């Protein structure tokens, strides 16, 4: 009998403990008190505190009603409004991440207003009507507000319900889903070597047709190209074409390459996609239609493994589990005239690959900063300053301000940092070691390089 009584008391103890665990969130969920840089506080103010106790079960139920049920049913009614009010009254700014995700797709005045008011209450900030999604998301990133519980589930529901084709993309992995947003286009999910087929996407080009210099009369000498050299073979990828395609799967010098161009961060990169571990097929890279802090998100069409485009590292799927990280070849940003003079036997992509378009994104870039949210930007250089980025042999990221480095090299000065030596190539710049071997450098906007390499060294000239 005593055993039964004690067992009953033990049962009640467990029941009470579980109930309390569901009702209260403890300090584990509190925002880490990591000191923010002064420039972040000056621009965005102090972040709101995250409550250490709250009714998590009730809030999660409200999230389901407002964001999961509402999106799946394509309905925003009284139940959703009341659920959103409950979330706003929680004083927990973590839930603004989900509000931000729905903001990105919202086009209704009433819903926009309700989402803005809820975000404003939780962030303790007045949110402007204009660009409310951008302002909210910039604050979340800059303050490094943690994700709410079960965040990926809610985000996945919003994104995959509204835009088809992302079901295999939104999975757990080494990716910070807080920073993933919609780039305004749908996924390119065409199989390898079918890129002549039309798509309602940013259309990659597989095995693009090329010509020699003589037959490339359509290119002006001052047109910008991205030059790549592999095993003594040279190829120019005109920016006009890359602004349309944004992704090329090619073969040069006997090596397979995947070449993404992120128009938003001014970075063309060249990744080797051959010489994979046994059992791993060549990754065929595509544009997902998603962004991470204004940097395009690419993925492998064979496995739906997502890659960090800037780092070349697989972050989800089978390739992430195998630890795949792609090595880079240098990409030189040069004028066509200087590139062909330096490399008269170069090949170049054919004009037809531009599909008759000429976006000229670069020269129409917003002078006020990135057009998608990026949060705080390292203030050592201006946001859209061009840099040459490279990693040293010791693993240290280094950025060279392109304008200063170019002038120094033109004057015959040597630029060296650890094992890095900068060299002129056409009228662009590439990094090599003391033996002249390629170190996989590329040009990018400062905001992009510094956010993916926050500890980067900046060459001071």
Predicted feature residues:
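Boundary at the C-terminal end of the N-terminal hydrophobic targeting segment
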Residues: 28-32
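N-terminal secretory signal peptides that target proteins for export/translocation
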Residues: 1-8
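Alpha-helical segment of the N-proximal tetratricopeptide repeat
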Residues: 82-86
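Mid-to-C-terminal functional-domain signal that highlights helix-capping/loop sites
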Residues: 34-74, 78-81, 96-461
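Bacterial N-terminal signal peptides
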Residues: 12-23
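A composition/secondary-structure signal for short, hydrophobic, low-basic-content segments
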Residues: 4, 25-27
């Amino acid at each position: 009998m005593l055993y039964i009584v004690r067992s009953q008391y033990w049962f009640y103890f467990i029941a009470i403990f579980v109930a309390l665990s569901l009702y209260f969130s403890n300090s584990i969920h509190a925002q880490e008190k990591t000191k923010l840089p002064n420039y972040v506080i000056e621009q965005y103010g102090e972040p709101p505190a995250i409550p250490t106790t709250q009714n998590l079960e009730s809030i999660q139920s409200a999230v389901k009603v407002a964001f999961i049920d509402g999106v799946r049913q394509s309905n925003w009614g009284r139940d959703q409004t009341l659920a959103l009010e409950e979330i706003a009254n929680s004083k927990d700014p973590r839930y603004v991440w989900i509000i931000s995700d729905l903001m990105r797709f919202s086009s209704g005045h009433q819903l926009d207003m309700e989402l803005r008011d809820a975000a404003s209450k939780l962030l303790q900030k007045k949110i402007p009507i204009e660009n409310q999604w951008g302002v909210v998301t910039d604050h979340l990133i800059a303050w490094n507000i943690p994700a709410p519980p079960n965040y990926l589930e809610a985000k996945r529901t919003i994104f995959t319900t509204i835009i088809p084709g992302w079901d295999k993309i939104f999975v757990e992995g080494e990716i910070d889903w807080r920073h993933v947003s919609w780039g305004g286009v749908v996924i390119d999910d065409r199989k390898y070597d079918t890129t002549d087929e039309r798509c309602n996407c940013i259309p990659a080009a597989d095995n693009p047709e090329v010509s020699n210099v003589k037959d490339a009369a359509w290119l002006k000498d001052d047109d910008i190209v991205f030059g790549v050299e592999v095993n003594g073979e040279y190829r120019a990828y005109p920016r006009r074409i890359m602004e349309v395609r944004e992704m090329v799967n090619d073969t040069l010098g006997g090596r397979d390459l995947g070449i993404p161009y992120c128009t938003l961060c001014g970075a063309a990169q060249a990744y080797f996609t051959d010489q994979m571990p046994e059992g791993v097929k060549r990754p065929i890279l595509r544009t997902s239609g998603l962004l991470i802090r204004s940097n395009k998100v690419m993925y492998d069409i064979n496995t739906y493994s997502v890659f960090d485009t800037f780092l070349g590292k697989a972050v989800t799927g089978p390739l992430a589990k195998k630890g795949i990280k792609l090595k880079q070849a240098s990409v030189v940003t040069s004028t066509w005239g200087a590139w062909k003079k330096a490399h008269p036997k170069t090949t170049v992509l054919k004009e037809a690959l531009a599909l008759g378009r000429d976006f000229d994104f670069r020269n129409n870039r917003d002078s006020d900063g990135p057009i998608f949210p990026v949060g705080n930007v390292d203030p050592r250089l201006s946001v859209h300053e061009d840099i040459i980025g490279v990693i040293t042999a010791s693993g240290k990221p280094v950025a060279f301000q392109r304008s200063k480095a170019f002038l120094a090299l033109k004057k015959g000065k040597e630029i060296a940092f650890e094992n890095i030596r900068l060299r002129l190539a056409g009228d662009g710049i590439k990094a090599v070691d003391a033996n002249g071997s390629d170190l996989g450098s590329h040009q990018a906007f400062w905001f992009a390089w510094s956010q993916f390499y926050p500890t980067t060294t900046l060459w001071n000239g």
